[in-house]
Amino acid sequence: MKSFFLVVTILALTLPFLGAEVQNQEQPTCFEKVERLLNEKTVKYFPIQFVQSRYPSYGINYYQHRLAVPINNQFIPYPNYAKPVAIRLHAQIPQCQALPNIDPPTVERRPRPRPSFIAIPPKKTQDKTVNPAINTVATVEPPVIPTAEPAVNTVVIAEASSEFITTSTPETTTVQITSTEI
């Protein structure tokens, strides 16, 4: 019974697409001739995606199967809706002059850098070898390392003279380390 209702629903959805002929709204390229220059046909599409979403017994197809036939074949059902495509025969060619494209481009094109711009120029070879007159033995300054030594302070409280509180605070001193390495 479910399959019968499914077939009836599919037929009810596809009959308007199969019976009705959609007229192409494309304007002719020549303004002198009002009649159509080319024999144009429109391609009809089959709404399978709607039926699959309505009836979960078909299951959801997660993969789009691409058919190995031309897209303009009107006898093969397609899973999605698409705009009708006009098919033109190659025998009839319009004898009209093409209008120039007046609209400016919307995207600004950037120039590509040439390989000569990217290439690094070769180094010039010098005839003489110049020895620098700089002292190569550098003096090493000893690093300064701070060390912390704890100092003990005693504080006497006037109220409790028998108790002493000791606190330790670190004091920082700097010690210079000298090395004889060169």
From Swiss-Prot:
Glycans are attached at T154, S161, T178. InterPro entries: Casein_kappa. Mammary gland specific. Secreted in milk. Pfam families: Casein_kappa. Keywords: Glycoprotein, Milk protein, Phosphoprotein, Secreted, Signal. One of its GO terms (biological process) is lactation. It comes from the Eukaryota. Transmembrane segments: none annotated. The keyword Phosphoprotein applies. Residues 1-20 form the signal peptide. It is found in: Secreted. The record marks F117, I118 as: Cleavage. One of its GO terms (cellular component) is extracellular space. Disulfide bonds: none annotated. The modification Phosphoserine is found at S161, S179. Belongs to the kappa-casein family. Kappa-casein stabilizes micelle formation, preventing casein precipitation in milk. This is Kappa-casein. It comes from Camelus dromedarius (Dromedary). The gene is CSN3.
